[in-house]
């Protein structure tokens, strides 16, 4: 029997090669979202609620991403927003959102992104995964954020380094809203309490770009409830490699319950305020006890 301590450690992945594949896949998919977008684009289906929409372009773009990534790395797992999880044998999983900001895309608002990341661990388990490389690409503007573990974060090749944050009352704060009406009531209550405490609040409609804007200095801090691994994986690494932190509240990892991102001192203050407001608590009931 071999002593575990004498076994060779698993080889570290080639971060540069993985990052190049992230960017290649995101850019290829981005071309399709712009060039093949129908003029009469409509909702193909809904998911969690009538406002949680999927277009045919979401499906087409995810299929393309799966084809590109599985051809290049057949041993790796795949997890996409629209078509679910395929496990692999390598310990790496590609996590992607073909169109993050689908409602913006549906309305032809040019703030959406293709998000592609590769992670170690199990992205189906909260706190059970860690990104290795990622790319967030806005196909309309061409803005491309990239990050690799230990090699930094970049916007269009320019290294990103976050500076000292302002106090909370001078912080331009980003957020997003969910799809269930009860969740939205909770979020509205939290925003109503926070708005007098911050410089202002922005709701841009694309979580991956929101997070990258924090890394770029266009937002000071960001919080949102309801995000999944495909929303987070690439942009989380961009924030971390730029010198920021991404966490949950109440000692929890960043996950569906809550994500807070920015420079550590500001994140700690905002996270404490969100915890005080029970921002990750039960959704608000409908007036009069009616069901959503």
Model-assigned labels for residue ranges:
Residues 88-154:
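DPxDG-like acidic metal-binding loop motif
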Residues 50, 141, 253-256:
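Short acidic/glycine-enriched loop/turn segments that link adjacent beta-strands
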Residues 1-99, 286-292:
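N-terminal subdomain of lithium-sensitive/metallo-dependent phosphomonoesterases centered on the IMPase/IPPase/PAP
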Residues 59, 82, 98-101, 139, ...:
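Generic detector of well-ordered alpha-helical packing
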Residues 33-36, 58, 69, 102, ...:
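Residue-level signal for inorganic ion chemistry
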Residues 161-292:
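An extended, acidic
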Residues 46, 86-88, 124-127, 146, ...:
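Solvent-exposed alpha-helices and their adjacent loops that cap or buttress functional pockets
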């Amino acid at each position: 029997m071999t002593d575990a301590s004498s076994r060779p450690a698993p080889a570290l992945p080639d971060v540069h090669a993985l990052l190049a594949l992230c960017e290649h896949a995101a850019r290829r998919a981005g071309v399709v979202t712009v060039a093949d977008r129908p003029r009469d684009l409509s909702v193909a289906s809904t998911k969690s609620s009538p406002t949680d929409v999927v277009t045919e372009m979401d499906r087409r773009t995810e299929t393309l991403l799966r084809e590109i990534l599985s051809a290049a790395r057949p041993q790796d797992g795949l997890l996409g927003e629209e078509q679910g999880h395929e496990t692999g044998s390598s310990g790496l999983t590609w996590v992607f959102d073909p169109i993050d900001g689908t409602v913006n895309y549906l309305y032809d608002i040019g703030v959406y992104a293709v998000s592609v990341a590769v992670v170690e661990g199990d992205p189906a388990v909260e706190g059970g995964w860690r990104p290795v490389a990622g790319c967030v690409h806005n196909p309309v503007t061409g803005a491309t954020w990239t990050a690799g573990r230990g090699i930094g974060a970049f916007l269009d090749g320019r290294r990103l380094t976050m500076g000292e944050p302002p106090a909370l009352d001078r912080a331009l704060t980003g957020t997003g809203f969910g799809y269930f009406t009860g969740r939205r009531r909770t979020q509205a209550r939290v925003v109503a309490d926070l708005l007098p405490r911050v410089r202002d609040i922005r709701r841009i409609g694309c979580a991956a770009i929101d997070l990258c804007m924090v890394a770029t200095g266009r937002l000071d801090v960001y919080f949102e409830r309801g995000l999944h691994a495909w929303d987070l994986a690439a942009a989380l690494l961009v924030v971390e490699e730029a010198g920021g932190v991404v966490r949950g509240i109440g000692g929890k990892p960043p996950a569906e319950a809550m994500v807070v991102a920015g420079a550590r001192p500001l994140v700690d203050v905002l996270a404490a305020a969100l915890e005080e407001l029970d921002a990750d608590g039960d959704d608000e009931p409908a007036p009069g006890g009616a069901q959503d």
